Amino acid sequence: EGREEYFPRELSGGQQQRVGIARSLAIEPDIWFLDEPFSALDPLIRREMQDEFLRLQGLLGKTIVFITHDFDEALRLADRIAIMKDGMIEQCSTPDEIVLNPATEYVRKFTEEIEKARVVTVEAIMEPLGEAKTSTNAIYGNKKLKDVAKILASDAREFIPVKDNNDQIVGHINRTMALDIVFG
C-alpha cells in the first residue's frame, strides 16, 4: 500500500521478493519455478513469506519447482525433495522417505542432524488397517510425530489407530516404533 509508483530497486528486500513472486504468477504458469526465493530475507520475513507461499500453493494448486540450499526450508515446504550431488540426483522422494530411508551415504549425512519427529508424519509409518479396529483415541495420519508425542508416550496400547480427515480409521502405528523415531 502506497508503493505503487516505486521501482523494485527502491523497495526493501522483502518487498522485492514479494514483487518477484507476484510477477512470476502474473503470467499464470502451469509450472511455477522459484530459485532461492527467500534467501535474502531476515528470519522473520522469511517465515512470513514461506507461510504466504504455502497459502498460495494451497489456493492455486500449482506444480512448483523450488530450488533451495536450505534443507529445513525444503522439508517445510515440499511434497517431494530431490537431493543433488555433483549435478546428479542422489534421492528424490517425500520428506518422510528421505529422512527415514536415505538412499545413499551422502543423503544419510545430509539428513543426520534432522529431528525426525518434526518431519515424519503418522501416515508415513502407518500400517494400513490391521489390529487397531477401534477408533478410540485415534490420531490423525497427517500429523507430525512431534505433534502426537504426548499421546504416544501416555498411551499403553501397542498399536494406536490412525484416522483420516473424515475420522475414518485407515490403519495403525506401532507405538514402540513411533517412540523410537520421536526419542531416537
Please provide the spans of the model-predicted regions.
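ABC ATPase "signature
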Residues: 92-93, 101, 172
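Conserved signature/switch motifs of ABC ATPase nucleotide-binding domains
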Residues: 6-9, 27
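Hydrophobic anchor residue at the start of the ABC signature
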Residues: 21
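The conserved cystathionine-beta-synthase
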Residues: 134-157, 161-166, 171-184
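A short, surface-exposed alpha-helical micro-motif characterized by mixed small hydrophobic
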Residues: 74-76, 99
